[in-house]
Amino acid sequence: MNASQQIHVFSSHWKVESVIISLIFSMIFLVGTVGNCLVLAVLIRNGQMNTKSTNLFILNLGLADLCFIVFCVPLQATIYTMDEWVFGAFVCKAVHFIIYLTMYASIFTLAAVSLDRYLAIRYPLRSRETRTPRNALTSISLVWALSLFFSSPYLSYYQQMDLDGTTVCIPAWSVHHRQAMDICTFIFGYLIPVLILGITYARTIRYLWTSVDPMQDMSESRKAKRKVTKMIIIVAVLFCLCWLPHHLVILCMWFGHFPLNHTTYVLRILSHLVAYANSCLNPIVYALVSKHFRKGFKKVFGCAFRNRVVNRIHTVQPAQTVSLMEAASSEGSNHCDGSTRGRLWSKSSKKMMTSAFMTFNVT
């Protein structure tokens, strides 16, 4: 096989891989966007952020994942599917900054919620004064402040450059500075938080499974705490497992034998895909483990479907309108709140008085 044939085969091979990578990134984007939006909708709709600190942490985790999915995943997909960087110097800096900002925010939030769960399980009465929504918001503010501090160097870490007529977005720091930065990211953005997670959840699990309950049957409150703790532990373990290959690849580049060839390039892509996929896994975990979230997802879908049906009703005769409204109201009462039904009836009555035809626009 001559050189031109080899180039053709290699090019065709990478075209196939580019299509596969694009499909995987698209799936991550779709599942992550829909899933995290549903999580935020369930928490905000139920209005439980003001009563439970754990829900605030879950809300913050979903917000960080959603920001990562929306702002980073589409742009990162182009790095592996396009020949050059086309989004400009500012986006080159911003996208990598947001990647590490949301990564730090997620792992710090998981560390904070592990402490919250430990206090809730180990000291259920004494921790009530500490585990307040106000203190949770303070902790979340601290999480984002620390995340901003640790990720801000990445605003200058990457830079748009021209290499042999090709525009690329690559690290601009010297080798020694990049090595020091990557090591610090691994220590503060992975190793220390994972140690905190391991210690707190080990103590929590040991207490849950070894403490003696004076009652024969476990109380409903304790069962609920176990389920929530189980769900958060699964989320934390998935985060650690998904981001581990990313950090290992970077460490191997600095301290191991990691030559730049087709195999190592594929490994780097896979490490990124696994890390990015973590942002769409949490809603799936919530749906599988938590009955509360399953009911919340059904309610959100139910109301969205019924509102969509009502919005499609245009220019209906008055008699038909009344019957349709009664049907929509009676069906929607099981899923939508009373305020929505009230707005529906008030709007309909006003329009029926002024015209023989009606247009519904329930939001």
From Swiss-Prot:
Keywords: Disulfide bond, G-protein coupled receptor, Membrane, Receptor, Transducer, Transmembrane, Transmembrane helix. It comes from the Eukaryota. Residues 1-23, 76-94, 157-179, 252-268 are extracellular. Signal peptide: none annotated. Disulfide bonds join 92-169. Pfam families: 7tm_1. It is found in: Membrane. The keyword RNA-binding does not apply. CDD domains: 7tmA_Gal2_Gal3_R (cd15097). InterPro entries: Galanin_rcpt, GPCR_Rhodpsn, GPCR_Rhodpsn_7TM. Receptor for the hormone galanin. Receptor for the hormones spexin-1 and spexin-2. Expressed in neurons in the ventral area of the interpeduncular nucleus (IPN) where expression often overlaps with spx1. Its main location: membrane. The chain crosses the membrane at residues 24-44, 55-75, 95-115, 136-156, 180-200, 231-251, 269-289. This is Galanin receptor 2a. It is a multi-pass membrane protein. GO terms for biological process: neuropeptide signaling pathway. One of its GO terms (cellular component) is plasma membrane. The lineage of its organism: Eukaryota, Metazoa, Chordata, Craniata, Vertebrata. Residues 45-54, 116-135, 201-230, 290-363 are cytoplasmic.
